[in-house]
């Protein structure tokens, strides 16, 4: 990614909700790749609304927004919506779903070597295995379990086998934050990310960012 490249800008953005309440008025904002920006304001000042507009979640605004479509945006809401049927580990793994899928495909390919194959089938399988190996190495997939464990430990997540349905609001936020950080978005939007984090976790997050 090129330094000093503007990857997002908004021009004259306003947000009005019924009956006629102005939440945001005539906002101009641009930021470069790699920039770290804090949005400060009193409760109800429109901070969360601004982040939702940047994240593309709230399309109901006036003004103009331009951003590079090649960049992935990740957003942590104050009250994340997580699947209550999943475990903590299930949700965290969603942040590295592409790698998880590649590992599964790699295991399926390896399992096929136990079958009776023609020479052509064997050659195709070897070629496919090589392609998957290259992709996995590029993504440091062999260290995935360690990476997940370190992130979950740093953010003091509950037991990986715990159901999302039994977690408190603060625990859900930490799970969602862990998933988001592991997904490594180009634009990371965090709405009050240090809420429900202890001092050590806050320090880890600051170092990570």
Locate each region found by the language model.
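ABC ATP-binding cassette signature C-motif
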Residues: 1-209
